[in-house]
Swiss-Prot record:
Residue numbers on the Cytoplasmic membrane side: 1-25, 79-80, 130-141, 199-202, 284-296, 331-334, 381-385, 422-449
Gene: ghxP
Superkingdom of origin organism: Bacteria
Protein's name according to its UniProt entry: Guanine/hypoxanthine permease GhxP
Species of the source: Escherichia coli (strain K12)
Family: Belongs to the nucleobase:cation symporter-2 (NCS2) (TC 2.A.40) family. Azg-like subfamily.
Entry's transmembrane regions: 26-49, 60-78, 81-97, 110-129, 142-162, 181-198, 203-222, 255-283, 297-312, 315-330, 335-349, 361-380
Mutagenesis / variant outcome for changing T275 to A/D/N: Lack of activity
Keywords: Cell inner membrane, Cell membrane, Membrane, Transmembrane, Transmembrane helix, Transport
Residue spans, topological domain Periplasmic: 50-59, 98-109, 163-180, 223-254, 313-314, 350-360
Record's subcellular location: Cell inner membrane
Length: 449
């Protein structure tokens, strides 16, 4: 006779195809917790950035958790992929500093712009345009995007703990930070520990490292302190003003605002699409043609999350590259994403706990994932010289410009021009050329973020 737990495990396994994809329920939950810890910083960073632009931080905190929670749960249930949704940091910065502070657009109009961006983004996804872009993504550029994102993660993590800093002097743009600081030492030691644990195939090695460093930080770092467990979420500021449903769609249709909406859409299309492709590839969730399994559902969920963001008062949403931390921990199904979503909904009431995980506890995980993504170099076909070089150009300029879309644009342009100059124009397809022209025009017109 089967026990209730066995039946539960069986139903989970059947729904999420856990065994079929070579995983276990425990492995998926650990992967989800790993991803959550790697991206929980967003509930602090996003309210802080939008708060500088006049958004009520407490209300933004709630909205950020709702977007990440519900978006990730839908991704898991519908697309069955280990991809976590959250408010995109780059698009949050654009919303706060360019739209509101730079163009002096009101908060309701900015939220209307986010909503319109989400609607256009969803139309592009639902009509198959995003899938078409993925089908016309050259192999070199696709693998180069994965390499570039890996390098980008390494730079983000190293800069976040002060290992690499902006050069205060003339010369190169970056410089070595203070190597002897506690965050830097903990990050590098943590990276080495993760590598050792992964070599030994210790289950949940990344998660154990994050928890271990957090405990060390709580003991020795005065900036990490226990301030309680529970806190009731607030949907409005101290004056009772709520962001939910406060968007001004008609204001966002103003000709002055529309170019910014289109810039958000173009950036999201290529940034998020490249991220989803890279993380799915890292998790071996591509079919025999190199396309994402149930990719259409993932792309639509990703875009619809931005519609929800505009309604509840948050920044545009996107799949987080930190999802790769979960796939590195073994996540292969939507149960990973659902775990992330449930944890974000719980953190609504446990917000003090989010401050117990310092940046230097998650930095080693991001560094390790970045290193893993560099393995995409081995997937590049160097027998096709132009395609291979375009891929490497994509990778290098993603990290040099700190912008995924810019790297993809330069990679596409390099491929098309390289094919023409080398006499290999017959290898080009119309889709690749159209995307290259669209991206170059987007940048030449000054609309890029």
């Amino acid at each position: 006779m089967s026990t209730p737990s066995a039946r539960t495990g069986g139903s989970l396994d059947a729904w999420f195809k856990i065994s079929q994809r070579g995983s276990t329920v425990r492995q998926e939950v650990v992967a989800g917790l790993t991803t959550f810890l790697a991206m929980v910083y967003s509930v602090i960073v996003v309210p802080g950035m939008l708060g500088k632009a006049g958004f009520p931080p407490a209300a933004v905190f709630v909205a950020t958790c709702l977007v990440a929670g519900l978006g990730s749960i839908v991704m898991g249930l519908w697309a069955n992929l280990p991809l976590a949704i959250g408010c995109a940091i780059s698009l949050t910065a654009f919303t706060a500093f360019s739209l509101v502070l730079g163009q002096h657009i009101s908060v309701p109009v900015a939220l209307g712009a986010v909503f319109l961006m989400g609607v256009l983004f969803t139309v592009i996804s639902a009509t198959g345009i995003r899938s078409w872009i993925l089908r016309n993504l050259p192999h070199g550029v696709a693998h180069g995007t994965g390499i570039g994102i890996g390098l980008f993660l390494l730079l983000i993590a190293a800069n976040g703990v002060g290992l690499v800093i902006k050069n205060p002097l003339d010369g190169l743009p970056v410089a070595l930070g203070d190597f002897a600081t506690f965050p830097v030492i903990m990050s590098l030691v943590g990276l080495a520990v993760i590598i050792g644990l992964e070599k030994l195939k210790v289950p949940g090695g990344i998660l154990l490292t994050i928890i271990g460093i957090s405990i060390v930080g709580l003991i020795f770092d005065p900036n990490v302190h226990f301030s309680g467990v529970f806190a009731m979420p607030s949907l409005s500021d101290e004056n009772g003003n709520s962001l939910i449903g406060s968007l001004d769609i008609m204001g966002a249709l103003n000709p002055v605002v529309l170019p910014s909406v289109l810039a958000l859409v173009m950036t999201a299309v290529f940034d998020a699409t490249g991220t989803i492709r890279a993380v799915a590839g890292q998790a071996n969730l591509l079919d025999k043609d190199g396309q994402i399994i149930d990719g259409g559902k993932a792309l639509t969920t990703d875009s619809m999350s931005s519609v929800f963001s505009g309604l509840v008062g948050a920044a545009p949403a996107a799949v987080y590259i930190e999802s790769a931390a979960g796939t590195a921990a073994g996540g292969k199904t939507g149960l990973t994403a659902i775990t992330v979503g449930v944890l974000f909904l719980l953190i609504l009431f446990l917000s003090p706990l989010s401050y117990l995980v310092p940046g230097y506890a998650t930095a080693p995980a991001l560094m390790y994932v970045g290193l893993l993504m560099l393995s995409n170099v081995a997937k590049i076909d160097f027998a096709d010289f132009v395609d291979a070089m375009a891929g490497l150009v994509t990778a290098v300029f993603i990290v040099l410009t700190c912008n995924i879309v810019t790297g993809i644009m330069i990679g596409f342009a390099t491929l098309v021009i390289g094919r023409l100059v080398s006499g290999e124009w017959r290898k080009l397809n119309i889709g690749t050329v159209v995307i290259a022209v669209a991206l170059v025009t987007f940048y030449a017109g000054g609309w890029a973020i």
